[in-house]
């Protein structure tokens, strides 16, 4: 039975102080609280209904992203410029007057002056409205932003839902499938193929740029396409169309910020924006389309792809699979560790890090480049082109927009996929991403959702660990350190402070060293039952099998 997605249980929200409990051992509710997972919904960048708070007019009006007030306090040390600078050059033909840069790194006022509660919900519409109004440069000045907030969307979400194909085609046969329904949006004509996923306030559809008017994402535009590369041209025509009502401006803002804050080597690991249209009551977010599926898809189909772990599969009715080969699982974990370090250095918390929000990434090699067999952590030898692409930033947090030491509290009903602090109604910051990554690593290894237990240490501090023992033939010290660090981040820090970026970097480097030494293991041969691919289980061979599986799925 494949892993199943489900709505988290609804529970009243109470705030408790962060204090240690005097108990010897406590088992927390596992991610598979329900005994049997009947069905797993395919990937969708839309979060569940309980994860989204409705936006108000404060984020949709024409003045939503500007304010005439200019703060008089000196700039904070940690603030950096946060606005889109792609259109910083003016079009004036005459010399323009000297304009001083915003005093707070792209913000009009010091966030401490906004009067935000701490803790607060990161999806509270009043909070998001205040943050957007405090931006020094309106988002409407961004090149891929179409500001139509003075008019309504005229029921676009309902219309697209009505005409989208009910049957989901194979990823490999989309281009030659049924004729899509044409949706005209401003100067663009977009063909709607079918729904990819649905949430409480919107849905995601597979769409196609029919007239070539949808701009490419920054990463796509920087990669040249050969004239005879028909497959790549078709892939570029495809896009993921996220339609929401009310309009969701915040996710667009975060995605645009990351394309300027992240190191160039990490930008391809975050889904790129192609065009965003904001109406008074709806929004259309056009994103890169990931045709190779998600890590969760791969876990559920690991045996068919020929990349499953040698461990026996779970008992019938238990849900899940046997997980991935350890080498392949560690490769994806390293990619996510590197990306998470980059996000946190950019002062961004993803807030909804889970395995079905991780697309498998296969980028084209550079001209004249060959993919080497031996793993290279620095991305050389073609290894930069393989990895993950993170999606769904609807709950993401830009810490540069908040006062220092800001904490957060969930106003949605937390589920077993959420971090311990959320489930215990305690304030949190980076913990949500750490627990999310632990859950992904666990699922890659075991083929099912994470289960954790807790115990009280010698100094009276509660410590969390995974419930399932690590298999003896795995790299037990490496995985133990990873899970201990992610599940107990304050204990991993020398001073009990967050984030623990350096500590995670140390774990990542150890894993990279092991991969470099063991990425070309000999002697173990596996034949994929569906595709008949026989290859030694080295890392490059495993990734080739994943690519073949993705193309034929």
Model-derived features: positions:
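Helical subdomain adjoining the active site within ATP-dependent kinase catalytic cores
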Residues: 382, 424-428, 435, 439, ...
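Conserved structural core of kinase catalytic domains
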Residues: 269-327
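Juxta-kinase regulatory segment immediately upstream of eukaryotic protein kinase catalytic domains
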Residues: 98-193
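Activation segment signature within eukaryotic-like protein kinase domains
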Residues: 332-333
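Activation of the activation-loop gatekeeper triad in protein kinase-fold domains
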Residues: 389-397
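ATP-binding glycine-rich loop module of kinase domains
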Residues: 193, 198-257
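Ser/Thr-rich, low-complexity intrinsically disordered regulatory regions
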Residues: 1-133
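Catalytic-loop of the protein kinase fold
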Residues: 340-385
């Amino acid at each position: 039975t494949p892993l199943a997605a489900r709505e988290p249980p609804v529970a009243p929200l109470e705030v408790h102080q962060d204090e240690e409990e005097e108990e010897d051992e406590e088992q927390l509710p596992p991610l598979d609280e329900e005994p049997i997972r009947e069905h797993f919904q395919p990937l969708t960048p839309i979060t569940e209904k309980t994860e989204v708070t409705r936006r108000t007019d404060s984020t949709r009006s024409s003045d939503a992203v500007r304010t005439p007030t200019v703060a008089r306090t000196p700039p904070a040390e940690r603030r950096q410029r946060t606005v889109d600078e792609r259109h910083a050059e003016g079009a004036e033909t005459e010399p323009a007057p000297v304009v001083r840069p915003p005093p707070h790194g792209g913000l009009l006022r010091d966030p401490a002056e906004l009067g935000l509660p701490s803790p607060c919900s990161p999806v509270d519409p009043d909070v998001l409205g205040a943050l957007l109004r405090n931006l020094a440069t309106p988002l409407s000045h961004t090149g891929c932003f179409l500001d139509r907030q003075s008019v309504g969307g005229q029921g676009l979400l309902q219309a697209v839902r009505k005409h989208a194909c009910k049957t989901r085609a194979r990823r490999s046969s989309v281009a030659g499938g049924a004729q899509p329904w044409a949706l005209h949006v401003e100067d663009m004509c977009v063909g709607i193929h079918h729904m990819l996923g649905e949430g409480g306030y919107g849905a995601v559809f597979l769409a196609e740029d029919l007239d070539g008017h949808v701009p490419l994402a920054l990463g796509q535009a920087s990669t040249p396409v050969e004239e005879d590369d028909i497959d790549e041209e078709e892939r570029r025509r495809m896009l993921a169309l996220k339609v929401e009502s009310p309009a969701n401006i915040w996710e667009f803002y975060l995605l645009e910020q990351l394309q300027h804050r992240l190191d160039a080597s990490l930008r391809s690991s975050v889904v790129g924006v192609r065009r965003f249209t904001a109406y008074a009551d709806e929004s259309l977010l056009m994103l890169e389309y990931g045709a190779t599926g998600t890590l969760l898809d791969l876990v559920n189909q690991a045996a068919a792809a020929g990349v499953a772990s040698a461990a026996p599969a779970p008992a019938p009715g238990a849900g899940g699979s046997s997980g991935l080969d350890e080498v392949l699982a560690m490769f994806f974990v390293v990619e996510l560790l590197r990306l998470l370090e980059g996000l946190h250095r950019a002062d961004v918390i993803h807030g909804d890090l889970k395995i079905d929000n991780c697309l498998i990434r296969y980028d084209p090699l550079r001209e004249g480049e060959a993919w080497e067999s031996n793993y290279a952590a620095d991305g050389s030898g073609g290894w930069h082109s393989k990895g993950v692409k993170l999606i769904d930033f609807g709950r993401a947090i830009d810490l540069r927009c908040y006062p220092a030491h800001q904490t957060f509290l969930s106003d949605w009903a937390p589920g077993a996929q959420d971090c311990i602090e959320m489930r215990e109604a305690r304030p949190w910051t980076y913990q949500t991403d750490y627990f999310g990554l632990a859950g992904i690593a666990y699922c890659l290894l075991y083929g099912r959702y994470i289960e954790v237990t807790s115990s009280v240490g010698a100094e009276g501090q509660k410590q969390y660990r995974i419930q399932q023992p690590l298999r003896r033939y795995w790299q037990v010290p490496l995985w133990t350190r990873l899970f201990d660090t992610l599940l107990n981040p304050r204990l991993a820090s020398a001073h009990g402070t967050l984030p623990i970026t350096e500590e995670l970097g140390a774990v990542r480097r150890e894993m990279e060293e092991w991969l470099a030494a063991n990425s070309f293991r000999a002697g173990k041969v596996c034949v994929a039952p569906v595709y008949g691919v026989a290859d030694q289980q080295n890392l490059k061979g495993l990734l080739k099998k994943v690519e073949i599986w993705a193309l034929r799925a």
